[in-house]
Amino acid sequence: MIRELMTVQNKPVELLLTSAAVKKGAPIDVDSEDQTVKHTADGLGTKLCDINATYEGLNAIVEPTDDAFENAAAGVRVRVIQTLPGEMYATSELDTDTLQAGDKLQAKGGKFVKATAGQYAYEYRGIYSDPTGIKMGKIVRVEIATAG
């Protein structure tokens, strides 16, 4: 899940197809050759995934819930969120039980984890109290720096 808490408005919107399954709020990479998206296996994760709600089938008559659009299979169009330093997001793609406010974050396996060495682009800022009850943590995009 992803919530855009403090972001720069009117950024260009990039909609791309996934080459593998991704989760909403996950750090992603864009393949420059075929312009597809996959979760960040190991790196900075400076781009985030957002999955737009679709109002087809049952969702045409019943308002879908947030969790109805948590996962995107391969070949699904997703919105690529280009993050900028200073922006704040809330995401479910981290383990809030193992992190403390101020921890530096890297992307590994499509999730945010504590950076112990190497470069990082995010800081953990604590738990986000989402009105839907989804367990989320606040992250702030920072200038790229080296941990350790």
What are these regions (language model features)?
Residues 1-148:
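Surface-exposed, low-hydrophobicity beta-strand/loop segments enriched in small/polar/acidic residues
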